[in-house]
From Swiss-Prot:
Organism taxonomic ancestry: Eukaryota, Fungi, Dikarya, Ascomycota, Pezizomycotina
Native organism: Penicillium rubens (strain ATCC 28089 / DSM 1075 / NRRL 1951 / Wisconsin 54-1255)
GO molecular function annotations of the record: DNA-binding transcription factor activity, RNA polymerase II-specific; RNA polymerase II cis-regulatory region sequence-specific DNA binding; zinc ion binding
Composition bias type Polar residues, residue spans: 240-264
Compositional bias segments (type: Low complexity): 30-48
Keyword Transcription: yes
Source taxon at top rank: Eukaryota
Pfam family, one: zf-C2H2
Gene encoding the protein: brlA
Disordered, as annotated region: 23-64, 240-265, 391-416
Protein's name according to its UniProt entry: C2H2 type master regulator of conidiophore development brlA
InterPro entries xref list: Znf_C2H2_sf (IPR036236), Znf_C2H2_type (IPR013087)
Gene Ontology cellular-component annotations: chromatin; nucleus; transcription regulator complex
Length: 433
């Protein structure tokens, strides 16, 4: 009779929506149980109602906090089938252990912790390892030599003095961007390989580095080692952090930082030049470039020393040709200028004006030509007007030599020796009147 009732209860199933219940409060979403059996529900598959074979349920103690859970795709809707025999109250539903939840509906750990990678092979934590879950950031501090690969942890950065920068420990950030980075950083650089190069923890003395000397890291104080190059192997080059945007801010992981003084801040570019090995040709070119300003400055100093009042040359050079006449202070640069000047002091005036009645003589021909232009070529003056010397006149002819009419026009065919008819002897002053 009981088996017959159990078959009837197996056939009568009711679908109940569980929207208001959370994943911890809702019983198994793809399982059905019989209230006629033991208090512990026996899960059976919906697709095989009569079958008593059920998958093994994992114990609640098997799930460890912090372990990723397996995600399975399932098309089962968020509905549960319950038998109506023992569901008169909500006690059976609320007292249902959470361990009966199917693995298909358990939320994967990456959905709760987006910081973890999808590659779960790197995140399996041994059970015998001590776990520190007191802090909300759930850091897992394990010794680095136990793992070959490092998983990214965005929530915690170890505060240890022997750690290298993230660019050296993270393979994703150690890809060569410039050609210089490939020579200094090997492709197989990892934290496990670099820990052997670091000196012992006892030899590390914390030192404070100002922002002017080293590029600031995202978090944590920077404590570079104070040991010398002898702590490192001879065939291993010293690793240096280098950023193209701030070339003068570089720090060596194997050399002491030294004291921070204003002089050291002023000489930041010199430290940058010492980080790279300079070729002999480039070093010689740099030395010559630094020497050239000193040579220029020495030349400028010599010129400034020569610019004293005693060493200044005379602005007007002392002329060589002087007039020898007493009382004359004439000075000339050329010999011909002096000869022309000497004619003015002599009594000889060979250049005489040809205008009738003028007879003015000059010692130089240029003075006579100036006399023609200024005296006889203009009307209304005291001197006689000559039309042949006026450039604006129709009778302009500077080479004409002969007799002139009373108004100054030329008489062609006449000569200077000839006398004017019916004119008598008239003076120049009479012509002017």
């Amino acid at each position: 009779m009981r088996s017959h009732g159990q078959q009837i209860s197996d056939r009568l199933t009711v679908e109940v929506d569980c929207h208001s219940l959370g994943p911890s409060e809702c019983p198994s979403m793809t399982s059905s149980f019989s209230p006629l059996d033991s208090p512990t529900p026996t899960p059976t598959s919906l697709y095989s109602q009569g079958s008593m074979a059920s998958p093994g349920w994992p114990e609640p103690s098997h799930y460890h906090h912090g372990l990723p859970m397996e995600r399975r795709t399932s098309a089962t809707p968020l509905r549960s089938a319950f038998r109506m025999a023992d569901l008169t109250s909500g006690e059976g539903m609320m007292n249902m252990p959470c361990g009966n939840m199917d693995r298909q509906e358990q939320m994967p750990l990456p959905d709760y912790l987006p910081g973890y990678d999808e590659n779960v092979d790197q995140l399996w934590i041994p059970q015998d390892m001590p776990k520190t879950y007191q802090e909300p950031q759930f850091p897992y501090q394990a010794s680095m030599p136990q793992y070959n690969q490092m998983a990214r942890n965005y929530y915690h950065r170890p505060q240890q003095a022997g750690y290298l920068p993230e660019s050296a420990s993270n393979p994703c950030l150690s890809r060569p961007i410039f050609t210089q980075s490939t020579e200094r950083m090997p492709n197989s650089a990892s934290m496990s390989n670099m820990l052997g190069w670091m000196p012992s923890h006892e030899s590390l003395v914390p030192q404070t580095i100002t922002p002017a000397q080293v590029q600031p890291f995202p978090s944590g104080p920077v404590t570079p080692p104070s040991s010398s190059y002898s702590d490192f192997p001879a065939n291993i080059p010293t690793f240096k952090t280098h950023t193209p945007s701030t070339p003068h801010r570089s720090v060596s992981m194997g050399t002491p930082s030294g004291s921070d003084t204003p002089v050291s801040r002023m000489s930041g570019h010199n430290d940058y030049q010492e980080d790279f090995q300079l070729s002999p040709v480039y070093r010689e070119g740099m030395m010559q470039r630094h020497r050239q300003p000193s040579r220029k400055s020495s030349k400028k100093q010599l010129l400034r020393s020569n610019l004293s009042l005693e060493n200044l040359p005379s602005i007007i050079k002392q002329v060589q040709f002087k007039c020898k006449e007493p009382g004359c202070k004439g000075r000339f640069k050329r010999q011909e200028h002096l000869k022309r000047h000497m004619k003015s002091h002599s009594k000889e005036k060979p250049h005489v004006c040809w205008i009738p009645g003028c007879h003015r003589a000059f010692s130089r021909s240029d003075n006579l030509n100036a006399h023609y232009t200024k005296t006889h070529s203009k009307r209304g003056g005291r001197n006689r007007y000559v039309a042949t010397l006026d450039e604006t006149s129709q009778d302009f002819d500077p080479d004409f030599r002969g007799q002139l009419t009373p108004d100054g026009r030329p008489i062609y065919g006449s000569k200077l020796e000839d006398t004017m008819p019916d004119c008598g002897e008239l003076s120049v002053d009479g012509w002017d009147d």
